[in-house]
Amino acid sequence: MYKRQRLTFLGADHEVTGSCHYLQACGKNILVDCGMEQGNDVYENQELPIPAADVDYLLLTHAHIDHSGLIPLLYAKGFRGRIFTTNATKQLCDIMLRDSAHIQMFEAEWRNRKAERSATLKKFVPLYDMEDAQNVMRQFEGYDYGCIIEICDGINIRFTDAGHLLGSASIEVWVEENGVSKKFVFSGDIGNVNKPLIKDPAYIKDADIVVMESTYGDRSHGGTPDYVGELKQIFKRTFARGGNVVIPSFAVGRTQELLYFIRKIKEDNEKDNYLPEFDVYLSLIHI
């Protein structure tokens, strides 16, 4: 009996975090991303809406926690399927998922000390622990961009550089079932062009169904900003007042770009002495 392919949005449908899509095809249950919602309390409302043990495969677009952060929870709930991603994303997840577990365990210790002194606060239980984060990495398989991978009879996938983060990808999924072929494309997070450390995104030309992120879909970026020039002006104004510049930044991706721009400013400064000499300190959590 012919069964329709089904696509269900489990996360990031009315928000920009917690990305998770559920594709049912060829008798298989496939998740595309399994991200953690991020907001005032990132550990609330994170229950998985499907039985984890029923998931056969997980396709991962990139390592940011809002796309990968619930993978250890999926494992803790019984998922033992294969995880397909790029080589770089696999390596980053090995660091970032363990870091996520460490943060949760540290926060649990802090919250539970407070709960012991309160009649109203409940005991806090992490979504997953370090063992879950380490064990699920055994299910990761890393692949190069451009390779066509058969994940099962009737389903092939390919990763294409999305230009967002080291290892980030858009994923093409070809499904052939009951003599009918369809191509799904999951964009993942798409990067901008002319970035200093990451290649421009490679665009996919055809698809039957496209699932696309649209975080910045309502605005035009215009030309490439002069990040070095703008930072240089901020440094000059702040140093002239005897101040220090503090820059909050995402640990993976943005911090490395900032360090690149600051290095460029220091190199230029050796020639024109536009600024006084200054030191750069990086928070340990960003290393």
List PLM regions with ranges.
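Conserved small/polar residues in nucleotide/adenosyl-binding loops
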Residues: 1-5, 285-287
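His/Asp/Glu-rich metal-coordinating catalytic cores
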Residues: 4-59, 68, 75-255, 263-273
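Active-site recognition of the HExxH zinc-binding catalytic motif
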Residues: 62
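Short internal beta-strands
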Residues: 82-88, 278-285
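Phosphate-binding glycine-rich/basic clefts of nucleotide- and phosphate-handling proteins
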Residues: 260
